[in-house]
Amino acid sequence: MNAPTTVADSVTVPVSLGDRSYDILIGKGLVERAGEEVAKRLKGVRVAIVTDENVAAVHLERLQASFARAGIDSTPVIVAPGEKSKSFATLETVTNAILAAKLERGDAVVALGGGVVGDLSGFVAGIVRRGMNFVQMPTSLLAQVDSSVGGKTGINTAHGKNLVGVFNQPQLVLADTQVLDTLSPREFRAGYAEVAKYGLIDRPDFFAWLEANWQEVFSGGAARTKAIAESCRSKAAVVARDERETGDRALLNLGHTFGHALESATGYDSSRLVHGEGVAIGMALAYRFSARMNLAGIEAAERVEAHLKAVGLPVSLAEVPGGLPPAEKLMDYIAQDKKVTRGTLTFILTHGIGQSFIAKDVPPAAVLEFLKERLAIA
């Protein structure tokens, strides 16, 4: 596993993918340093900065000034905030804006925003002129520790989440920890679900550290930077082994099969459920289901739920506002999960804290019965 290195006020985590390797820089002040860092790696480029209205209001001017200082011309492309921008309509709008600006294949798309902007921008960068350069500047905790690393990009459809997209690795990730101070408490908590996930997959020591230090992670400082760097380190190691999710990269989907089904069931309405909240409930359900299938003790599920509750995350179906459809409908959404192979269900289940594994051919009847039980409790 690649160890983070500290250089100048930032931590660097390498992602090792041969000639497509890149660095994740983590630290304060990276928005101001962005022009300098991009100019080092991509000579003579112009950039399209894809961002949403909320992020643009707070960070766009500083980023454009940084690019201007480095002699880089930038064109902003601003989209509506929220999951609904991961759509064919917005994809077309952003693509047309980049083409209208006459950006060339050797130029770059810079994603300044959370996971939605990153996923959308990466897809655009992968298909416009058959592939432009791509730089991730994640502004949410969730994006800094998860979606900005590893090259997964895409949009949603009426059939489910992330069903259309490409693998497109960035040339650079700049994770400015200072921008996290502008997040709402709810947004920060949602991102923390993905941080906890890395401990639950295969790093019980990291999960125990989070249990002891989560309050400092939330308040900022060294613990926050460490949590982000360790999360990126975990993901970078998995991506280096299995870039295209043909093997154990699927472990990173712990909690996501249930979570994506809940997001679909709530119509991607962020007032009801955001991605990280869906993942938190999904991880709690994965641990409960593992216990129900006699794969793990109930104590592990209770420990996971206790920690997620402590930080203010939901852990049950009852906590989804506005109610949920019947278990049969949730199963329809689960059947659209990208881990489904030839009609059989694949889940990330667990033998305990830090002992997750890929479970293939999970009996649909067992999942349906489990969902009925959890909905009845709701």
From Swiss-Prot:
Q: Name one Pfam family in it.
A: DHQS_C
Reaction equations catalysed? 7-phospho-2-dehydro-3-deoxy-D-arabino-heptonate = 3-dehydroquinate + phosphate
Quote the cofactor binding remark. Binds 1 divalent metal cation per subunit. Can use either Co(2+) or Zn(2+).
The protein's matches in SUPFAM superfamilies, at most eight in alphabetical order, are given as:
Dehydroquinate synthase-like
Sorted alphabetically, which InterPro entries does this protein's record hold?
Dehydroquinate_synthase, DHQ_synth_AroB, DHQ_synth_fam, DHQS/DOIS_N, DHQS_C
Q: Which GO terms describe its molecular function?
A: 3-dehydroquinate synthase activity; metal ion binding; nucleotide binding
Q: What is its EC number?
A: 4.2.3.4
Which coarse location class applies to the principal site listed for this UniProt protein? cytoplasm
Tell whether Nucleotide-binding is among the UniProt keywords: yes
**Binding-site residues for Zn(2+), renumbered to this chain:** E194, H256, H275
Q: GO CC annotation: what is one? A: cytoplasm
Q: Print the keywords alphabetically.
A: Amino-acid biosynthesis, Aromatic amino acid biosynthesis, Cobalt, Cytoplasm, Lyase, Metal-binding, NAD, Nucleotide-binding, Zinc
**Gene3D superfamilies given in the database record:** 3.40.50.1970, Dehydroquinate synthase-like - alpha domain
State the similarity comment.
Answer: Belongs to the sugar phosphate cyclases superfamily. Dehydroquinate synthase family.
Role according to the record: Catalyzes the conversion of 3-deoxy-D-arabino-heptulosonate 7-phosphate (DAHP) to dehydroquinate (DHQ).
Q: What is this protein called?
A: 3-dehydroquinate synthase
Name of the gene: aroB
